[in-house]
């Protein structure tokens, strides 16, 4: 409103314009003084201006998906002492909001007869890294057709240990995600949990799990609670990345997924981990047991 008054004041005068807009002329002059002499503004107003810049930075650095709680927690991690209600107030003024998750579309094709038993029973907890992995995949619509994105997640801290983007739902694509996870972690005795999708209960996949010393586990088909953690990651990925724009092709989705996985593992704050990123939580665990190599 003030820029409009600035533009019209020479033609119509401040008094008549303020009268028409139902504001006091003193309000206009006060705003003018604050704009031209920012150092004379109240301490709260000056701090708000500084906080807005910090809030915008945190929001931008985290893919513009953080809501009030995550922005507030990140500011606290950086040593910026601010009340949550202040962050909420300023984000509302700035028009910033977090991204909400959508619903998962079923992609599972069942092969119940050859599936392994359920070793997890919906207890998605782990006392250490590489004790329990969960796997699932989702789909992404692009201009050139559907592509599919598979994730393997370590339950202890939610670290994504393997992922792959493919133009088909063939078993080889989830096998590629598994190979990446095996190469990165070198696990032994890890429980690998998935749904009863045909890719995960295929002979090739189950044989590779056995060769690597992993213990296969499957939940019931069509029940999201039996693979809740993996489906939660899929939902987060779709909400924070995929649903925010249209995608041209597989390569574009692959690059965006690479960027997101790096952010998720190394910078995204998880409340259950004391508002720390997964990578940091794993390092803290290894430091606590004296494993300096993995804690570094």
UniProtKB/Swiss-Prot annotation:
Domain Integrase catalytic: 125-285
Sorted UniProt keywords: DNA recombination, DNA-binding, Transposable element, Transposition
Organism encoding this protein: Shigella sonnei
Keyword presence, Oxidoreductase: no
Protein's name in the database: Transposase for insertion sequence element IS629
Biological-process GO terms, alphabetical: DNA integration; DNA recombination; transposition
Molecular function (Gene Ontology), one example: DNA binding
PANTHER family according to UniProt: TRANSPOSASE INSF FOR INSERTION SEQUENCE IS3B-RELATED, TRANSPOSASE INSO FOR INSERTION SEQUENCE ELEMENT IS911B-RELATED
Database matches in Pfam families: HTH_21, rve, rve_2
Biological role stated in the UniProt entry: Involved in the transposition of the insertion sequence.
